[in-house]
Amino acid sequence: MHLFDLPKIDGHCHVLDPVRFPYPPEVPYHPAGQEVGTAAYLAQVMAAYGTKHALLVGPNSGYGTDNRCLLAAIAASPGRFKGIAGVANDTPASYLQELKAQGIVGIAFNYALHGLGHYADNAALMARLAELGMFVQVQFELRS
């Protein structure tokens, strides 16, 4: 069987569409040029490679905790995409439930960008995620 005939899932990709969803000004880095990729562009790339599903990760660079672009991409492709959202430590369970209902399966902790201190007070958030059956994706840098 050829590689293109095998079912494939992209386990981590980003959708960035600053024309439809402008970046919040407080986010320290705004991807541009070749770093930008809309949901429509992602669908074309997935079709070209025979990728059936994807886990979309809301990028901390660009959107921070603004999940509108991520949620729009999931809504436009019912059943094809699931998502990892960015949220604040004090995010209430009701908002996490809303995210889950819209296809979000977990949230991201980006220690590489925010550092350890940013997530120091997250025990209550972790408990709310566990109650909802959601997970945490952790991104970090190895420093020697």
Predicted regions and their residues:
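An N-terminally biased module of ancient metal coordination in phosphate/nucleic-acid-related enzymes
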Residues: M1-T65, K100
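Active-site gating/metal-coordination segments in enzymes
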Residues: G64-R143
